[in-house]
């Protein structure tokens, strides 16, 4: 394990290395699950705070791994540690694969040299000892520097005991004066200053992943990560002796009797088995809600205190969790780090990618106990179950009206707040269940900051807003270099993608590809229920609702629900009386465009619907259907 004290130049910005702790693979597998959870919380929160404080910190690989649920250890070659050949390994370290050069140490952590890997590594106590070393070299001035907030200390006291509480001073030195920075270790008497070249690791751009797997095309930032990944294809063990899953010789292999999944730690197996048993031993003292994991309880308790320590530096919005802040900031940056390996679609949230991947597999693990209908998403099942229970958990705090689905409530709130449905600071939304609040927390944070002055429409992302403006203006927002990038459209008003069959032109390549399927007949999107195929993904989504019964679009006036947004728009015109489609010949207006087309045939005399029995022609399909009943009755 390699904690790093601050070593930056006097006026240099803080780097994430200054507040990070690294593990090798061997060290990580000796950290018990509770301490792993603490480590994840601390690392993610420290990174989030550096970003929120305005530091230009590129995202390290360890943060990518933690966000995606991967194990965060890195190879020994990537950990910057001085080497001491005269250091002697403790005799208690019995595992043969550990009898090698483990004499690397980072910045005076002499006490860490004697920590046996046969014992469980205690993250918080190791960090406390590291802090004592730092304070010995840095002096009292270091303790006055600005702090990076760690998880709730009271909760950590209850979880690990007061003496093992993570010391927040560990990561406080953001701008330490040069005169109190250590350059020589008093314990070992060796110069431990970093080589300047080693500090350039952050020059690797977070989004660039140059190392790709030849078999599955998955990309990685570091070659060591690719090497580790390739072993999963070869079936090799993760360790030199060929052992799998980090199981050392002599360690007991804990296997779940329900699903066969294996674990290194008995505590890991115990936590996993709660999925099968439904046990939730950690209960909130305030509301009584129970959780499977103590970390989930700690996050939940923040909701009662109302504390929101994580603030966005761009819009000022505050959050109770660092992960919520990180997700919120992607609204401003447009970042979508979670990419589907099958279709290339990207998402802002890992959960969204997980839900999307189910559409490729066709798996529907969520089944209704009432009618047996199955769904690919838990949220779809929850919405469906309300058709049986009649539950309407989303209540308007202004007029008291309740809705079965959150989108219906958001649309309703526009009546009260004139098109600002997401500004939760201007009004409150009451939820009858705390689970509903949790599910919609990320949705409520979606502020539509970009306003179109021409038509009044609001947008959450600047890319959507820029695309929309092309409708109103021919002004060129791109310079010539940007215009020919893969993702940018050439110039506003231009339609560079032209169909060579019918000549129709499009602004976007995706629209052109979808249109071209009309000519080729290609229908790549197939329904898993009935086998019907579609040329567009959106058409398949709408079709699948005929099987699930899902109707997410609800009329705020009468409560009637629809499976398609276009059907809701047409229905709402029955309340407003709006008839936007007007005949140029006689001035008659209609609510539906199809009704206008049918009407215009009166003027043109066109009769495109022909009876196959007698050859009679009709201007409307409904008239043909009615006529065909005559032939059907005659045959009977």
From Swiss-Prot:
There is a cross-link at residue 448 (Glycyl lysine isopeptide (Lys-Gly) (interchain with G-Cter in SUMO2)). The keyword Coiled coil does not apply. Keywords: DNA-binding, Isopeptide bond, Metal-binding, Nucleus, Repeat, Repressor, Transcription, Transcription regulation, Ubl conjugation, Zinc, Zinc-finger. It comes from the Eukaryota. A zinc finger (C2H2-type) spans 211-233, 254-276, 282-304, 310-332, 338-360, 366-388, 394-416, 450-472, 497-519, 525-547, 553-575, 581-603, 609-631. Residues 14-85 form the KRAB domain. GO terms for molecular function: DNA-binding transcription factor activity, RNA polymerase II-specific; DNA-binding transcription repressor activity, RNA polymerase II-specific; RNA polymerase II transcription regulatory region sequence-specific DNA binding; zinc ion binding. GO terms for biological process: positive regulation of DNA-templated transcription; regulation of transcription by RNA polymerase II. It is found in: Nucleus. InterPro entries: KRAB, KRAB_dom_sf, Znf_C2H2_sf, Znf_C2H2_type. Expressed in heart. Isoform 2: Highly expressed in regulatory T-cells (Treg). GO terms for cellular component: nucleus. The keyword Kinase does not apply. Coiled coil: none annotated. Belongs to the krueppel C2H2-type zinc-finger protein family. Inhibits the transcriptional repressor activity of REST by inhibiting its binding to DNA, thereby derepressing transcription of REST target genes. Interacts (via N- and C-termini) with REST (via zinc-finger DNA-binding domain); the interaction inhibits REST repressor activity. This is Zinc finger protein 90 homolog. The gene is ZFP90.
